[in-house]
């Protein structure tokens, strides 16, 4: 039903200037969840954004706004009056409002803060003190806190009275008089409690998994993956409860980290903008420096070839198999690197596992290299009609190349981790250049030894 409603909405937007369509448009919008409405907004030209946003049901407007990309949010803010902007900011959860302030240019930030309530402004400024990629930077302060001496009935009354403005009430956090975190109790436990006079301290779980305000956001997201939480409490250095990180933020973190790693692994500067929201200049800046670096690095391969020109001149057929050998080596190295980086990202592999990594990769490389060499040897003899000694040179090089490539692919991510460099930045872009040069050196030296060049 959602897909058909989206299609209907897009069709109606084509005739947005027809005033009779506005009520029908609002009716369709009321049937759509916030993420689907936000997807429609992303496809609209800037001048139509405020018009459609004003038709949003009041209880949905802030949720739709929070789902938009920063670029679209800025376009929409530019088209809203101060009164309309104030209504949006007041309805945003404080972590979403903080994200908005972090993403906007200074002139827009001044306007946002000017429209925010003093209490909201204080909370935003408090969250902005933490590093952007830390638990403190992504947490929200809108949580449900209870006291251990409360009864179940008192706790339920507190939740009914204050829960509407909280980001989640699935878990309620129990704090002492100094706001130190002492336990957690689920809404389920409160609802199902048979004795409404039972104190919270008898129901709560005192073994609470929490994170510090300075914990890296990627480490926080791993805890969600490990424990299946919907929220994780955040405490300061004195174990005082200062906020929570919710599952929606954890999912966003995982998506951002994955996008960043994929970009880095392919030698592209990461960007938080969608592809079609990036200008040609943005795309150029994210790619050109890496391409230039890799082009310069590739000159090592040219130097190797120039150093063995006599061998190539004597047996020119060797030249024909250089692309196949370097491609096979690069592919094998990339497979190894990607596997190790992924293992390190999910915690399966640690730097001290390097000896085990090399032992496993070596055995896999010999199996893969042997299989490729046998197939290639038969192809060269039967189809290419190449002399057996030359075929032997190529196939021995193929085995050595696969072996060296997978060993290098296993070492680079671990070395990057030891040097406190992102493995995706160091390992993936460099693997092809290193393997190409290594492959050529092995190839020409085997050729010189076996063909007596």
Language model: regions and residue ranges:
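Membrane-water interface of transmembrane alpha-helices in multipass transporters/channels
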Residues: 307-321, 384-396
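Juxtamembrane "helix exit" motif at the C-terminal ends of alpha-helical transmembrane segments
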Residues: 295-312, 375-386
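Non-transmembrane, extramembrane segments of multi-pass ion/lipid transporters
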Residues: 122, 249-283, 334-357, 414-420
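Alpha-helical transmembrane segments in multi-pass membrane proteins
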Residues: 34, 290-298, 321, 325, ...
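Interfacial loop-to-transmembrane junctions
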Residues: 415-435
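Hydrophobic packing positions in regular secondary-structure scaffolds
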Residues: 1-269
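Hydrophobic, small-residue-rich transmembrane alpha-helices and their short perimembrane loops
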Residues: 304, 317-335
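Soluble-to-membrane junctions at the N-terminal ends of transmembrane alpha-helices
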Residues: 273-293, 351-370, 391-394
């Amino acid at each position: 039903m959602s897909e058909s409603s989206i299609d209907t909405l897009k069709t109606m937007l084509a005739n947005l200037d027809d005033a009779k369509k506005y009520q029908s448009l609002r009716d369709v919008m009321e049937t759509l969840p916030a993420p689907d409405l936000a997807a429609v907004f992303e496809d609209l030209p800037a001048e139509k954004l405020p018009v459609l946003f004003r038709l949003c049901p009041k209880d949905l407007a802030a949720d739709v706004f929070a789902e938009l990309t920063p670029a679209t949010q800025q376009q929409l803010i530019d088209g809203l009056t101060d009164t309309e902007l104030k209504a949006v900011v007041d309805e945003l959860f404080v972590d979403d409002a903080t994200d908005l302030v972090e993403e906007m240019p200074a002139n827009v930030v001044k306007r946002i803060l000017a429209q925010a309530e003093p209490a909201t402004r204080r909370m935003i400024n408090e969250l902005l003190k933490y590093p952007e990629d830390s638990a403190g930077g992504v947490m929200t302060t809108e949580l449900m806190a209870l006291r251990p001496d409360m009864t179940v009935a008192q706790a339920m009354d507190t939740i009914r009275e204050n829960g509407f403005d909280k980001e989640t009430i699935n878990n309620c956090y129990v704090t002492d008089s100094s706001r130190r975190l002492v336990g957690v109790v689920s809404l389920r436990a409160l609802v199902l409690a048979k004795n409404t006079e039972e104190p919270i301290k008898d129901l709560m779980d005192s073994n609470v998994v929490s994170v510090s305000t300075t914990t890296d956001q990627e480490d926080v997201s791993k805890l969600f993956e490990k424990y299946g939480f919907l929220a994780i409490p955040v405490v300061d250095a004195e174990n005082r409860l200062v906020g929570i990180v919710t599952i929606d933020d954890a999912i966003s973190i995982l998506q951002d980290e994955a996008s960043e790693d994929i970009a880095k692994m392919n030698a592209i500067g990461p960007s938080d903008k969608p592809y079609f929201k990036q200008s040609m200049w943005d795309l150029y800046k994210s790619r050109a420096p890496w391409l230039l670096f890799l082009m310069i690095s590739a000159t090592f391969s040219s130097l190797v070839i120039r150093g063995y020109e006599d061998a190539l001149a004597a047996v020119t057929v060797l030249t024909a198999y250089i692309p196949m050998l370097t491609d096979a080596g690069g592919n094998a190295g990339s497979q190894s690197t990607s596997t190790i980086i992924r293992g390190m990202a999910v915690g399966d592999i640690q730097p001290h596992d390097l000896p085990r990594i090399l032992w496993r990769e070596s055995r896999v490389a010999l199996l893969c290299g042997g299989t490729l060499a046998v197939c290639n040897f038969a192809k060269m003899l039967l189809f290419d009609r190449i002399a057996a000694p030359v075929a032997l040179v190529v196939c021995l090089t193929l085995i050595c190349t696969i072996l060296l490539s997978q060993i290098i692919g296993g070492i680079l991510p671990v070395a990057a981790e030891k040097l406190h460099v992102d493995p995706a930045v160091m390992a993936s872009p460099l693997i092809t250049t290193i393997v190409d040069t290594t492959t050529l050196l092995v190839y020409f030296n085997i050729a010189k030894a076996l063909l007596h060049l």
